[in-house]
Every structure is written in C-alpha cells, then in structure tokens.
C-alpha cells in the first residue's frame, strides 16, 4: 500500500467499554460446538496488576487480559483483529456464557460501516470450537463456554474479528483529506467484556451523544500493523517498532 504527499495520523484509543444484560429472546445462534471430543487443557499465562488512582484510593486488581493483533486496511476502510481474551470469573455465580460489547457494529448501514464479522471462535485451552450468540442489539454478542466457569476460575477464548470503519468525523470513523489520503480515528474499536453485577451481565443501549460506555479495567497487549506512511498515536507504552515490506508494526 502506497500513500504519498502527506503524513497521515491514526488515533487508536482503546477505551474499555462494556455493558450487558442478556435476554433469551430474539437471539441468533451460529453453533459450531463439538462436545464429543475431550482435550487436555493448556495452562494460561495471565497477567494480574494492582493499581491505585491515588494514595488515598482503594487498590483495584486488574485481571482480565486482551491480546490483540490488529491490522488496518486503509484501502477498504476496515481492520482485522486476532483477539484472545483471558477472563476471570470475579463473581459468586457460575457462568455458562460470557458477554461482549461490539460498538463498531452500531454503524451498520452500507455507507457508514457494517456489522462486524466474527469467525474462528474457540477455547484456547482445549481448542474446542465455541458457540457465538448474536443479540437483537447488534452491539452485543455472547459466547457459550465449553464448560461452566466457576467463581475465581480462569478461561481463555480467541476469535478473528473484522470491522468496517464509517466515514465520520468522530472518535470512531475516518476522514478523507488532501490527495485522497485518510485519517482514521479508532476509539472503542475492540470488542470488550461486559461487567457482571447483581447476578447478570450489564449493558445499556448505545447512543451517539455523551458517554454510554461502562466496563472494568483490563490489561491490553496490542500489536498494530499499519502502512509505513502512517503515524500511530495511541495510549499505552510503545515497546517495539518493526518495518516489514510496506508496513509498520508497533
């Protein structure tokens, strides 16, 4: 991919946004489970961090981890992510499903994006295929676990995710600038876990103005692949930059 005459900016702001109460009505299921085969579980290397807002605030333990390999397709205004999520059941209840918020799917008309695509959904410990359940709200989906997740237990799931960026001057969108070059703004671009509170997963309807996002903090390890002619501006610590052909990997 070649882009000339201007240095373009991508803003990747990974906001931790979540919300989920799931009802069993109006759900569409893509079932690809195989319960007949048993696998030996692979141990999960999970990172746990304890933080404080200030010296007077209580400590908060961050246990959920996202490992994302993000590739931006500037020609087709979309991106692909291979995403692994390590999830700890921090409640007193047993979970048979876990729920995600998928905000990019809010832009579902043909000119301003599409509903995202999720494939290759599986349990990373056993390599068992998992069931994807679509909610009536396109920004919500759930994953049926291979086995019940008891309190304090850890599981890890992985899937391939493709999302389409709308033509919008907003925190999630792209703008065409001089010489048909583009700026991409990619806030809330990764699916995130919904908090579990009061006996259920919490989510609220998406609305365009204001803040409707609710989630818990998590650890993010993100690898971003962009054209060399682009500059990445993002939160977090930049650990390494690699050049491969016409791409820049950070």
PLM segments and residue spans:
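Extended, low-hydrophobicity, Ser/Thr/Pro/Gly-biased non-transmembrane segments
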Residues: 160-250
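Intrinsic-disorder/low-complexity, polar/charged segments enriched in Ser/Thr/Lys/Arg/Asp/Glu/Gln
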Residues: 65-67, 78-84, 97, 140, ...
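Asparagine-centered strand-capping/turn motif at beta-strand->loop junctions
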Residues: 87-92
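Solvent-exposed beta-hairpin/edge-strand motifs
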Residues: 46, 95-128, 187, 225-230
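N-terminal Sec-pathway targeting helices
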Residues: 1-12
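N-terminal, polar/Ser/Thr-rich
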Residues: 7, 15-17, 21-80
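Beta-strand-rich interaction surfaces with strong enrichment in secreted/lumenal proteins
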Residues: 68-71, 85, 130-132, 144-149, ...
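A surface-exposed beta-strand-loop module
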Residues: 39, 108-180, 246
């Amino acid at each position: 991919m070649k882009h000339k005459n201007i240095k373009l900016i991508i803003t990747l702001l990974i906001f931790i946004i979540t919300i989920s109460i799931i009802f069993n009505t109006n759900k569409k299921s893509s079932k690809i489970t195989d319960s007949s085969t048993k696998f030996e579980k692979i141990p999960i290397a999970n990172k746990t961090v304890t933080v404080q807002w200030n010296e007077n605030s209580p400590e908060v333990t961050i246990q959920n981890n996202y490992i994302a390999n993000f590739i931006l397709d500037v020609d087709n205004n979309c991106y692909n992510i291979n995403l692994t999520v390590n999830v700890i059941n921090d409640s007193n209840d047993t979970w048979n499903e876990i729920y995600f918020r998928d905000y990019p799917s809010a832009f579902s008309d043909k000119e301003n994006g599409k509903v995202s695509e999720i494939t290759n959904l599986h349990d990373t410990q056993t390599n068992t295929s998992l069931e994807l359940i679509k909610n009536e709200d396109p920004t919500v989906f759930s994953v049926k676990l291979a086995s019940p997740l008891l309190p304090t237990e850890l599981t890890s799931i992985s899937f391939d995710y493709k999302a389409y960026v709308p033509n919008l001057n907003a925190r999630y969108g792209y703008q065409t600038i001089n010489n048909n070059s583009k700026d991409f703004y990619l806030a809330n671009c990764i699916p995130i876990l919904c908090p579990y509170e009061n006996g259920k997963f919490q989510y609220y309807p998406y609305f365009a103005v204001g803040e409707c996002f609710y989630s818990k903090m998590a650890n993010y390890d993100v690898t971003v692949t962009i054209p060399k002619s682009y500059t990445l501006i993002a939160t977090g610590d930049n650990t390494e930059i690699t050049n491969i052909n016409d791409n820049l990997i950070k």
